[in-house]
Amino acid sequence: MVERFDFGVALKKLKEGKKCRRAGWNGKGIFIELQRPDENSKMTHPYIFIDTTGLQTDNPDAPKDRVPWFASQTDMLAEDWECID
């Protein structure tokens, strides 16, 4: 059984280097991750991005990208967060 938790726990796990997703997200194969800038980065602070490059869909026009992510209120209040390998 997959461990599920709230966004506070998900945020803590992101800070530990884990990748997280919501069980309730429609797209399978997508997740969020925390990016910490290094000396070669243009960003100066950590940020969360969503990775949709593994999105499993029959829609050939679906975006498969890595872009900055902002949590919705629904995401922040959800209790179906889980980590992936």
List PLM regions with ranges:
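Short, compact, well-ordered microdomains
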Residues: 55-85
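Extended non-catalytic interaction/regulatory regions in multidomain proteins
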Residues: 1-61
